[in-house]
Amino acid sequence: MKLRGLYAITDSQLLDDGRLLPYVEAALRGGARLLQYRDKSSDQARRLREAESLRELCERYGAQLIVNDDAELAARLGVGLHLGQTDGSLSAARALLGRQAIIGATCHAQLELAEQAVAEGASYVAFGRFFNSSTKPGAPAASVELLDQARPRLPLPITAIGGISLDTAPGLIARGVDLVAVIHALFAAASAAEVERRARAFSALFEPA
């Protein structure tokens, strides 16, 4: 599948109390192309259960599930993987998951990390945070000028993450970003209907003018 569009990322605090599946389905209905399951808890049985349910939803809507920082879970479910800089070897994950798996890499604000990820077999690279982030307030800041440098040098899709909203996403897309990764601006909503509305609005930003 072409890696372009809205990249929805779950948050276990935002999506508690039974909201995970209905809110995720709303995001997929609204056009999210990738969904990252991000849950840092140690409850492996629950994580497996939730990830299996999310995989079924993604298959239904033609989207791709990406698991955050758990190569074994990704391999068990036959889905993609996203690795941070401290989440283990990208080349080892590629060997485990195979050539066809989608594997993304966090590169913060460093073009050198992105070039290394390309060499190790990444499917996409992620830069950020570009704006103030509720999820990772202490993450290194990235500038939009980084995108100007990265686009001609990287042969892979570029993901932007970090405090992205409907107001700020267009400027990033105009600079060559292929995927906008969104958490709060998508899922911090009062209803599933509102999540779907926001997802449709983000997805529309990628449509030809």
Curated annotation (Swiss-Prot):
Cofactor note: Binds 1 Mg(2+) ion per subunit.
Any one GO biological process: thiamine diphosphate biosynthetic process
Cofactors: Mg(2+)
Xref: InterPro entries: Aldolase_TIM, ThiamineP_synth_sf, ThiamineP_synth_TenI, TMP_synthase
GO cellular component: cytoplasm
Pathway membership, UniProt: Cofactor biosynthesis; thiamine diphosphate biosynthesis; thiamine phosphate from 4-amino-2-methyl-5-diphosphomethylpyrimidine and 4-methyl-5-(2-phosphoethyl)-thiazole: step 1/1
A matching Pfam family: TMP-TENI
Entry superkingdom: Bacteria
Keyword list, A-Z: Magnesium, Metal-binding, Thiamine biosynthesis, Transferase
Positions annotated to bind 4-amino-2-methyl-5-(diphosphooxymethyl)pyrimidine: Q36, Y37, R38, D39, K40, N68, T106, K136
GO molecular function terms attached to this record: magnesium ion binding; thiamine-phosphate diphosphorylase activity
Catalysed reaction equations from the record: 2-[(2R,5Z)-2-carboxy-4-methylthiazol-5(2H)-ylidene]ethyl phosphate + 4-amino-2-methyl-5-(diphosphooxymethyl)pyrimidine + 2 H(+) = thiamine phosphate + CO2 + diphosphate; 2-(2-carboxy-4-methylthiazol-5-yl)ethyl phosphate + 4-amino-2-methyl-5-(diphosphooxymethyl)pyrimidine + 2 H(+) = thiamine phosphate + CO2 + diphosphate; 4-methyl-5-(2-phosphooxyethyl)-thiazole + 4-amino-2-methyl-5-(diphosphooxymethyl)pyrimidine + H(+) = thiamine phosphate + diphosphate
Protein name: Thiamine-phosphate synthase
